[in-house]
From Swiss-Prot:
The gene is plsX. It comes from Mycoplasmoides gallisepticum (strain R(low / passage 15 / clone 2)) (Mycoplasma gallisepticum). Homodimer. Probably interacts with PlsY. It is found in: Cytoplasm. Pfam families: FA_synthesis. The lineage of its organism: Bacteria, Bacillati, Mycoplasmatota, Mycoplasmoidales, Mycoplasmoidaceae. Its main location: cytoplasm. This is Phosphate acyltransferase. Belongs to the PlsX family.
Amino acid sequence: MFRIAVDCMGFENSVSEAVKAVIKYAKKHKDLSFVLVGDENQIRPLVENKKYLNYRIVHTTNEIGMSDSVLTAYRKKDSSMYLTIELLKNNEVDTIISAGSSSAYVALTYNLIGKIHHKIKVGFMSYVPTVTKRGFWFLDVGANKEYLGEELYYLGKMANTFITSVFNYQPRLGVLNIGAEKNKGFEYHQVVYNLLENDKTVDFLGFIEPRGLIKGECDLLVSDGYSGNLVLKSLEGALKSVGKILKKNYKINPLGALFSANVIYQITKTFDYKNNAGAVVLGLNKLVLKTHGSADAKQFYSTIRLAHESLLNNLIEKITKECSTFLN
C-alpha cells in the first residue's frame, strides 16, 4: 500500500480543497493510505464518515506563508509543510504533495530529503496541453533561476526517464530558445545543445521557440527556471483570456454559442490546465510533487493521480539508476 502525505495548508484556498481531492481519489483507489497534515479541527469533519478512506491526521495550525522567506520557513518546524517533508524524510510516507510556497518547498526538500547526485539541480516539471492529442512536459518552471549547460542536460535526461517510465513513450526533446538556429542563445544553450545532440539515448529536436509550443512541436521542453516560469505563466494567462473571450461571446450571441457548444467544450476541456496541475520535483532522492498556490480540489486531484502513477512505475528508482549511467 502506497502512502501519500498532503500538506493541506499554506496556499491560497481553504483546507477543504485539498481534503476533497483526497476523498475523491481514495474512493476509486482504496489501496492507498493518506496522511493529512494541517488543522485537525478543519480536516476531521470532512473525513470522519468516509469509511473507505485510509487516513491519519498530523495536526498543526501553523503554516508557511507565500511571502515568508526561506529562513523563516526553516524556523517554522511545526508548520504543515515542514511536518509533511519530515514524514517523507523519516520514511513514514512514499511521496508528498504541497501547494505552498515554491521557494520554501524547494529549499526544505533540498536540505531535508537531499538530491540524487551533487552535480544536478532540482527542477519543477509540469504538463502543458497543446492543440495535438498529447501535450508536452516542461521543466524547469521555477525551481532554479540559473543553470549551467551540463545541469540542463542532466535535467533533460532525468525528465526523459520520467516520461519513458511513467507514460511509456520516447519523448521528442527540445530546448527553449529565442530561435531555432544552432548558434542562438547564451553559452549554456550551446553547451546543452551539443550534449543532447551527441546523446543517442534521447530524441533531440534542437532549439524550440515559444511560438511553436501550443502547436505541439515537442513532447519535452527543457529551460532554465526563470525563462520557464515566464513562458508557463504567459501560456496560462493566454489560455484563460481565450476562455473569457468565449464566455463573453456566449452572452452576445447565445444562439451561435448553442450551435458551437460541442466545439467550445472540446477547446476548454483540452486547455484546462487543472486536469494536469501537478509538477514533479525532479532531482531529489524521494518522490516530491508540487501543485499551484491557488490550487482547488480538481488540481489537487490531478496531482495525487500523477503521484500515484509515479509510484506505480518506481520513478525515483529508475531515475537514480539512469543518473548512475552519466554521472560519477
